[in-house]
Amino acid sequence: MKRKTILWWGRFDPNYSRNSIIRKHLIDLNYKIIDFKPLVSKFGYMEANFRGVETPDLVWVPCFRHRDILSARKWSAQRNIKLLFDPLISSWDKEVHEKNRVYSQELSDKLRSKESALFKEADIVLSDTSVHADLFRRKLGLSKVKNPIVYVGAEENLFKPFPKNIATDRKFDVLFYGSFISLHGAEIIVRAANLISNQLDVKWTLLGNGPNLKECKRLAEELPNVFFEDNISYSNLPERINRADLLLGIFGDSTKAGSVIPNKVFQSLACGKTVITRCSDAYPEK
């Protein structure tokens, strides 16, 4: 039986976790993957024709590559090939709601209409949560487009339980790691630590860097049980997760924060750790 071929189209990062996880599973399912990274997204279809890119069974535009959609659609339509888009985010939703930029209703509607037309170019649009799927259908009009949910997941060959090193004199380590953006709500973690600051047998560790780190450090100035660690390499992250006793997810109160299940939740669960995160409709009921 001939192997089916999937053409990954766009100026994407194959090592980004969403991409690497999906690509590994596709390869495990015996799909052949071809990469095409156009020099200029807008003229990708011309470059693909010039370079004689192999005709695949499916064209896949990976996450964040909204600007590659139209060119990929033009090329795939000429060959009667289906186009799949894995956006991971709505640019309109991020611009208007997550970044809290002030737009008139008219301009917001124009941005939404533009993205709706873009998404409708695809035959299949993946969602990473049921909330995003609902957003794509209600706000971007994708009811007639196949819109399955594929969760972000984790690289299970990397994120897995390590042998336990039991030490009776160590403190209970509560770990948060991330980029300290508003979606993460790291300040809420520091405030929670303050509520039990008298329990010195609990160590709160916040690992990473980002725009809200300075504020978190300010809030933690008088807290003896809150510690900060610098960024570490991605390959060392599983070991650090396994050293912790409890992992923390995200606690932002924005609509966006309620729409996602972050990588850290899947990674920590894959390491066999208990995770506390905010409640939202994004999480499966079972």
Residue ranges: model-predicted function:
Residues 214-239, 243-246:
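Nucleotide-activated donor-binding/catalytic signature segment of Leloir-type glycosyltransferases, i.e.
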Residues 7, 167-193, 204-205:
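Conserved donor-binding/catalytic core segment of Leloir-type glycosyltransferases
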Residues 12, 177-181, 196, 210, ...:
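Short donor-sugar binding/catalytic loops of nucleotide-sugar-dependent glycosyltransferases
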Residues 93, 184, 233-240, 247-270, ...:
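Nucleotide-sugar-dependent
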Residues 48-50, 74-78, 105-125:
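Membrane-proximal helix-turn-helix segments that form the acceptor-binding/catalytic region
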